[in-house]
Amino acid sequence: LFFPSPQVLFGKTLGVQSGSSGAQDIDRYPKLLKQRIKKHTPVLYDTFNNAFIDLKADRIQGLLIDSVYANYYLQHLPNPGDYRVIKSGMPNEYFAVGIKKGNQEVKQKIDQGIEHLRKTGELQRINQKWFGK
């Protein structure tokens, strides 16, 4: 799902979801990604579900996908052991909760809720259930 180094991309068919950060990275790092994959063009998918179907059917050899999504999808596949997540060395992405600027009351409640989940171990259980880590 992720490639350990750019060298293993040579001639491989790589899938990516349209509009995703992975699709942006293909264009952002052409020497690292685009110039190495088959026909210098990834196979674009409207959903990761469709990409996983092609990955399972060997129509693509890899899928450029954020590890959060990869782990989530793998947890919900019938045979997750058929796949392997490999860190690519691409920059990490961070996720956030968006709220209206200046709304400190909502921010405080969200922060308190997340902290409560962390302290009670529930956040770790959620991560394990949905993302396998």
Regions found by a protein language model. Name each.
Residues 1-133:
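Proline/Glycine/Serine-rich low-complexity intrinsically disordered segments
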